[in-house]
């Protein structure tokens, strides 16, 4: 259980400046004398408390409830302690959570990236992980007790490639009267409607909650243009591509959770959810190849469309938890089923052709991919004696991937190519975690072992089958020291592994006029090791976190791009050696009662070596996010935020992204009793219509630059309305441990 940071009674809104002064003093002296400074700060806090108590006569005191709590492996934000939880949804509250950022399109990043999973009440919620922004937008913040960022997952999850876990802890009171929930709807100037509903009810010992949503993406909202120039080093020829595209369509999602209290010691919980989307993809491009002197060698235009493109993913989970009469001792059994199906049918025609280097006028591509996963897991937690706890568990995963790809070319011979590929993975794992807590010290150490067997099979017999056995030991350890009531220090060592998915493994060859791409069936799992040091200060008005860290790996999965003549070839390999230094910073400051400022900053210094291409890369970048909220008269709340990146962020060993910036403004007001009705107006980039994302390719067989332009969907105005009904007194209970799989890259996309 997380220990709350002690709070001090606040006399004046100007105490935030006092905290800033004390913090700056600490930062200067910290380098010279950590221990001495810790004792001085503790004394100063006690003296301040005494001074304030003596001067309180005749003064009205406004107490500030401490909203941020910390433990050895996580940081928690007290949603119920935030007055805004009465009128906002969970997605809004995430903007205030340390190390979490929300962009203008409501995409969620944790610790500056999308490599995370989302838990609900301590266990994985697959539907929530895949449709987070839609579900959390429909869920009222009043239904949530706190939000946790698990920064250092223990041995139970750590091997499976997740940088962080976002845990949504629901309200857990025992009784509920009737039905409670919320209805949400929004519409923006890009003709993009969105609807959502969250319902919860109790039937005897059973509690049920349902999330449902629908989004329609218009043609205007999905229009993009691009310009790319590629120079082939060996020939000196340059390819110029101007592209256009749009993908209007719709998506439905649902997430159902249920729990049943068998008795005070036994709990059964289940969930079912998923999403389905279908889009009408259309687009085209104009391609010109020029020689060194700029003279055209050939030219063509293409038009493509996908009359049948759909993707659906479904999952189910069942957990049984048994608690003993010993405090905090429990045993959990879990099963999870995940299904993903994807079908792509793309037709492409070439027109306005001049001296083209291929003999067909178009092609029809038909692709089907299936993914099925069964997971079984058992977990046991045993407190040994005061301050000591032991956790053990085991896990088995069986994955089946299959793909069927056929490509028919419109040429004189009506050539057809076909590739069938099946891939299975079996994983057996066991872990042990030990936690020690005494006084100001907390320590944690764990070890995980994973054995995996991968097998590739080609039903058409065109390629020989293959198999591979992998064994991985994954240690982790961390230690935390609470300097005083406000400050703490932590040192952590973590490792993780990542396995290739079917897209990376599938050797099927996809041929286009100027490019060829294929997978690599002989890829291995990759291992990353990290060392992190964390300093955290939690005060009444000011919260600060600094996390310098070092990451390194020697066989990471990476792209292999090369050229033969004027044709671009791409595949994958265990070819990257990388060393990365990062400095993560978070600050939350309340200089006045009605003002909140939040900032997340991540500085990255990245060194990479590509073994296959004998290339090196050194890039630095900084991602930033700043959020300012101001309460105004008449129940109005004004919010502004900006986010972006400066420097050069690596895309791969060959290319990097250029700086970019986004911003938005919001105005909100609540109506009716208990602020049940909330209306919000948002302006996203009102002064910039086009959204540019520029890239540069500076080494390898092909160099050049690109500019991807969202011509419409950067600038929009959105009106949102939400209505809460019923009185929330309970939420679906969940077992505190369950299944989470996140070790695959390059598979069928599961979304975020």
Residue ranges: model-predicted function:
Residues 40-83, 103-105, 111-115, 150-152:
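Short, acidic, small-residue-rich periplasmic hinge/interaction motif at the N-terminus
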Residues 90, 96, 123-151:
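Short acidic/polar hinge/loop motifs at secondary-structure boundaries
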Residues 58, 90-93, 132-134, 149, ...:
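N-terminal periplasmic accessory domains that precede
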Residues 40, 44-46, 217-253, 259-261, ...:
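Flexible loop and strand-edge segments within Gram-negative outer membrane beta-barrel domains
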Residues 167-183, 222, 226, 240, 453-456, 481, 485-530, 550-566, ...:
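Surface-exposed extracellular loop regions of Gram-negative outer-membrane beta-barrel proteins
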Residues 364, 373-377, 419, 427, ...:
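Outer membrane beta-barrel strand-and-loop segments of large Gram-negative receptors
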Residues 68, 91-127:
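Extracytoplasmic beta-strand/coil segments of soluble accessory domains associated
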């Amino acid at each position: 259980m997380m220990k709350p940071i002690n709070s001090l009674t606040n006399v004046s809104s100007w105490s935030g400046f006092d905290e800033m002064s004390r913090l700056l003093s600490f930062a200067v002296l910290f380098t010279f004398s950590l221990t001495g400074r810790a004792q001085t700060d503790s004394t100063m806090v006690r003296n301040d408390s005494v001074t304030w108590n003596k001067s309180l006569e005749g003064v009205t005191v406004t107490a500030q409830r401490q909203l941020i709590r910390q433990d050895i492996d996580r940081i928690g934000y007290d949603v119920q302690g935030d007055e805004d939880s009465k009128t906002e949804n969970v997605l809004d509250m995430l903007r205030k959570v340390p190390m979490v950022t929300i962009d203008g399109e409501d995409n969620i990043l944790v610790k500056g990236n999308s490599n995370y999973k989302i838990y609900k009440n301590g266990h994985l919620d697959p539907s929530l992980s895949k449709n987070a922004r839609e579900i959390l937008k429909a869920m009222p913040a009043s239904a949530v007790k706190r939000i946790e960022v698990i920064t250092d997952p223990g041995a139970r999850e750590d091997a499976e490639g997740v940088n962080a876990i976002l845990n949504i802890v629901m309200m857990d009171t025992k009784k509920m009267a009737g039905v409670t929930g919320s209805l949400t709807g929004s519409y923006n100037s890009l003709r993009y409607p969105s609807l959502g509903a969250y319902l919860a009810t109790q039937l005897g010992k059973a509690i049920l909650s349902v999330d449902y949503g629908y989004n329609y993406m218009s043609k205007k909202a999905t229009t993009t243009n691009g310009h790319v120039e590629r120079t082939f080093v060996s020939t000196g020829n340059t390819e110029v591509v101007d592209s256009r595209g749009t993908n209007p369509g719709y998506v439905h999602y649902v997430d159902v959770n249920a729990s049943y209290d068998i008795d005070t010691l036994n709990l059964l919980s289940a969930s079912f959810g998923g999403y389905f989307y279908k889009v009408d993809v259309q687009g085209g491009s104009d391609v010109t190849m020029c020689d060194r002197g700029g003279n055209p060698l050939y030219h063509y235009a293409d038009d493509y469309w996908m009359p049948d493109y759909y993707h659906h993913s479904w999952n189910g989970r069942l957990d049984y938890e048994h608690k003993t009469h010993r405090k905090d001792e429990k045993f959990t059994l879990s099963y999870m089923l995940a299904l993903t199906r994807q079908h792509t049918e793309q037709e492409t025609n070439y027109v306005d052709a001049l001296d083209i280097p291929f003999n067909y006028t178009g092609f029809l591509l038909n692709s089907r991919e299936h993914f099925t996963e069964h997971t079984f897991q058992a977990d046991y937690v045993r407190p040994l004696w005061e301050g000591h706890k032991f956790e053990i568990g085991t896990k088995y995963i069986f994955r089946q991937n299959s793909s069927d790809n056929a490509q028919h070319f419109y040429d004189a011979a009506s050539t057809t190519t076909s590739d069938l590929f099946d891939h299975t993975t079996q994983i057996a794992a066991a872990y042990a975690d030990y936690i020690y807590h005494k006084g100001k010290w907390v320590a944690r150490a764990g070890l995980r072992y994973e054995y995996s067997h991968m097998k590739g099979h080609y039903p058409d017999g065109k390629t020989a089958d293959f198999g591979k056995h992998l064994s991985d030991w994954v240690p982790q350890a961390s230690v935390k020291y609470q300097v005083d009531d406000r400050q703490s220090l932590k040192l952590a060592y973590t490792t993780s592994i990542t396995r290739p998915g079917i897209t990376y493994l599938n050797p099927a060859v996809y041929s286009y006029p100027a490019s060829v791409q294929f997978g690599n069936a002989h890829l291995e799992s990759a291992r990353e090791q990290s060392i992190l040091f964390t300093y955290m200060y939690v005060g009444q008005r000011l919260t600060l976190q600094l996390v310098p860290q070092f990451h390194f790996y020697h066989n990471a999965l990476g792209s292999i791009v090369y050229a033969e003549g004027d044709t671009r070839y791409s595949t994958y390999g265990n070819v990257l050696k990388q060393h990365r230094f990062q400095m993560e910073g978070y600050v939350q400051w309340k200089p006045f009662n009605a003002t909140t400022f939040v900032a997340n900053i991540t500085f990255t210094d990245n060194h990479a070596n590509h073994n296959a291409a004998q290339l090196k890369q050194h890039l630095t970048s900084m991602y930033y996010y700043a959020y300012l909220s101001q309460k105004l008269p008449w129940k109005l709340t004004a919010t502004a935020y900006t986010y972006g990146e400066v420097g050069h962020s690596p895309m791969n060993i060959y290319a990097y992204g250029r700086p970019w910036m986004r911003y938005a403004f919001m105005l909100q007001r609540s109506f009716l009793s208990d602020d049940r009705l909330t209306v919000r107006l948002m302006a996203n980039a009102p002064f910039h219509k086009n959204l540019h994302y520029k890239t540069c390719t500076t080494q390898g067989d092909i160099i050049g630059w690109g500019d991807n332009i969202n011509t419409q969907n950067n600038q929009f105005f959105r009106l949102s309305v939400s209505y809460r009904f019923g009185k929330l007194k309970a939420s679906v209970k969940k077992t505190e441990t369950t299944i989470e799989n996140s070790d695959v890259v390059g598979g069928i996309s599961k979304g975020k």
